[in-house]
């Protein structure tokens, strides 16, 4: 098949080019140079521009913006609980850090636009690439689409945006990783691994080392033993569990003669000859077996159902407490598999503080799970089912909300449809975490909406920009790329430098909160992963979530702001 014949097929079926851009973009994004890769998003953008240049497929705007709206709603829904939690007094320092970093980045971008006279398209790509926020590219393109210009100019500006984004994105990610993991620790004179060890030691500190009612974190093991140790005769279950607190043993059932006791309470008494069902981590069971008695194979007891559940923390009085405080007297028989806040997995340490909207992945008996749900919030039922009415309705309300405008000195101001969908998504996610009656969207579905929504949008942008990219490169030449790279370096580093100074000297944030906070304020998950790798600990994730949620919103809104500034500066 000749290239002309292939081009004809692609023009008849433009979806071929769309999905091909995603496929080739994945492989382009995987190419590493000294352990640095472009990533799937930028790879797809580049692949889309190349395929667009070769085949010029016509991708409907409806498809592009529909997928982008789904992406924005998913981002807002995920970040909603953390965003509104950042408005609380204890989270204000982290919120202030995010605001300063993102606003400084915007100010630097405006300065670069004024200096180099970038048009609105280049300005949009400068912000989205330098601050590694692809959502800002979409919101800026939405603003460009609404500009009162001829179609040729709009097409050229639309091509300039992804070109500038791809040019500045590389340093936007790599530069921030180097700053946060190498430069900033040297300026602060700290060692990342030592900082992590100290934070872990503080989080693991307990007020009562003998307390048996603490979350277990190891793989669950169920065993049955005949009670033969006379010292344990007539002891309560609580005393038994306290005796073997180091092994985290929990008695979940007892056979006494022909009587089978399930959901045993802490005040129940043991007797010699009882068959006891214990749940624990494997090492704990093995250690206790030497004292308790002979292990027996009681299949009826061992069939005691242990269930897994995801419990969302919604009770106001529980928010702000540590895992140790929650566990004391309330976590008997529960095993904490993982703890999640938005897209981040938190350390399962006794000092980790929880917030409303956090998700506990627990294993335990039905009674223990039910008790935990009453104490913490609610169990996520129908975890594989998405409330499509809530999702679609949220997008509709967001678009309508974004269309609202007010006039300031004759200039129309508004969020735009992209900003409207994002804000409504934030509110929708927050409302569900508080009132989980309707609106459930499971985490896998959110990830799918976010990933597919963004990648399809980026592929469509690249395909549309491809035919105009050559003209943009021809007009700008090497000088344009040099200006973009230089401006990108300034915009990427301006915010983190300001954040480092503010966080260290004014907010007095410790490095364990400051460094991941800067990464979150620049919305760069890759930087958090680099921090965790160099620091050898997941504890850095705690300081990432609040700034990430706040800056996700702010930098997305910077898209139309930078377009408006570029238009104003060009007059």
Curated annotation (Swiss-Prot):
Annotated RCK C-terminal domain residues: 294-378
Coiled coil: none
Superkingdom to which the source organism belongs: Bacteria
Location within or outside the cell: Cell membrane
Family assignment from sequence similarity: Belongs to the AAE transporter (TC 2.A.81) family.
UniProt xrefs under NCBIfam families: YidE_YbjL_dupl
Name of this chain's protein: Uncharacterized transporter BB1538
Organism: Bordetella bronchiseptica (strain ATCC BAA-588 / NCTC 13252 / RB50) (Alcaligenes bronchisepticus)
